[in-house]
Amino acid sequence: METQSPGKARVLIFSSRNIDGNAHYRCPHFEFEDIICKIDSAELFAPKADVSSLRFSFATRLAYRTPITLNPGIHGLSDRGRYDVFFTICAFPQNLLMFSGVSNFRDISKTSVCLLDELWIADIAKHRHFLRILEKFDVVLLYYSQTVKPLSELIKRRCSFLPPGIDAISFCPYPDPVQRVIDVYSIGRRSQITHQKLLEWARETRRFYLYDTIRGSQTIDSKEHRAALANIIRRSRYFIVNPGKIDDPSQRGQQIEIGNRYFEGAAAGAIMIGERPANEAFETLFEWPDAVTRVPYNSSDIDMVIKDLDADPERQERIRRTGVVQALTRHDWVYRWEAVLKSAGLAPLQAAEERKVRLRKLAEIASQG
């Protein structure tokens, strides 16, 4: 563990929160950034850019077609001194274009780290010019475990897998668990076959099935969105989970990756039902019994699965508590940040250890039957 001089940041976080707006897929990224600021000596740099401008559009279209990467309108980093770590999270390969505008990030940091969220193997070729920008970083981390090898081969740089995480404290239903008044909660992509079956089941049994009824990618406020999501899942008995882009094989091909929903469901103590990803990383991260109760995508038998689970209250309680404990002890953002620091050759600060102590105390409460 390291100590840090008061007022002197050792980490500079480049955040796109003023560029991407409050897109829902960005909310977990901002959650991670905010926790880093709480547990480390970090400074947040969040420049603005007009993504609808001609300049931004032209730079993006050009990078799709040529190896020329122009600044899309990002103001460069001013003289801020020197940091131990420069850290950024990119949602998609196109976001890497921002670092044509802040090319001096290597000059002001000992180690530069980029965490890339969504990158499918099938999309590597068309995004190759964007991905070349990753060659500027010292450390490249990926949320998609199966993309690590092909991306490493493209940029001739070792990439590593970093699993998604969760604010396990905010999502934790303990020490004061509330009544789970929502029977089934489904958010995001869904099977229409399973959805129609759940609608029928809810009508016939007068159960509460909560699901999306509008389309759109923007939240009003990212923090409020995450807080509301945590509140809803904590009040849900069953939470539907499936691998990323499960309904879009044209983009993902045969690739199977772990989405945020698995971490959210476990942390909030909901019983997760859906597809168990055929992914080696998943078997390491969610290896405990009943982590996910399998319901095949497009299944019309989900009502029978729920009926079987409802017949065994002791099993239900065990599933809930185990998921919460696992999230608190393994999947909180503090553990992900420790992995980032390790890649940069740094130790966590005291605030990180204090958060881990709090997580362990909550885990002790959750484990008590």
Regions found by a protein language model. Give the residues of each.
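C-terminal amphipathic helix plus adjacent low-complexity
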Residues: 303-369
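Active-site proximal beta-strand in glycosyltransferases
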Residues: 104-119
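Nucleotide-sugar donor-binding catalytic core of glycosyltransferases
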Residues: 2-83, 89-101, 122-285, 333-334, ...
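Active-site/pore-lining binding-face segments in mid-to-C-terminal subdomains
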Residues: 257, 287, 296-297, 320, ...
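Short hydrophobic alpha-helical runs that function as membrane-insertion/retention elements
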Residues: 114, 272-275, 293
